[in-house]
Amino acid sequence: MLNDFKQDIDWKNIQTKNNYNARVLFSVINKELRRGQLLNSLAVAKELFDSGEQFQNKLWQRLITITAEDVGLGNLGLYSYVCSSYEHFLKDYSFNIIYECVRLICGSKKNRFADEVLNFVLLKYVASNRDYFNESSKDVALNGETREHLQDFLKTRDLINSVKCFVSLAMSGNNFEETAWGALEDVMTVWETHIKQAYQMTLRMKPGKNDRLMAGVLHICGFVMDIVLDESEASVGNDKPMDLPRIFIPAHALDLHANTTG
């Protein structure tokens, strides 16, 4: 089933439709998307799309994760857009939907601040709850694979306090006015609702292990920075013929140790 992201596949020995090594192509699209290389990203995405459901599944996993981790606050509404695009894709299976997501990811500014916030919060949370994690499975608790553990995590004031501290530190050197932090008082009362919305939105699609938490962090950072999230859905059009170039395998994509395809 396409929307089951839990795959145990050794991509190293799998070839695409036109006999490219799958692991290499996933490395290429990871790194080309991050560098904004649109044509090569589209060429790789089309090859993966044409190669079947398993490849499409992994491609969507990468698009969603890169949007959350690498684009992040660079285009805050894009995470919601890619998620809704994925839902449209499950009904339409049109490459145009992937095309738009790739185009927007390539054209967006990249900002890993939210990913750093998430890592900081997770480390702080684990450090301050050692007794709990000695009795529980750390992987289950952090992966958010059960609603109970994830909601327990989201209810902790430690999360919003850590975000407040981290955001304040990051922005203090960028001429942000002190009055902007007055919005934090409002965030304290509404953040849980909006994080749960993000969590519910991603429950259906089973993204990577940190993506649900990342969605929550993106929403919090958005409220703190007074950014209005774009919840618009992707438009679906008819497939158009595309004259894409041949796939180029850059040297940096062959550094599989830096690859995050999993």
What name fits each language-model region?
Residues 26-31:
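Amphipathic alpha-helical repeat scaffolds
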Residues 1-11:
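Short, charge-rich, low-complexity alpha-helical interaction segments
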Residues 16-21:
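Short helix-capping and inter-helix turn/linker motifs at the boundaries of alpha-helical repeat units
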Residues 9-12, 23, 39-262:
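C-terminal alpha-helical interaction modules of replication/initiation AAA+ assemblies
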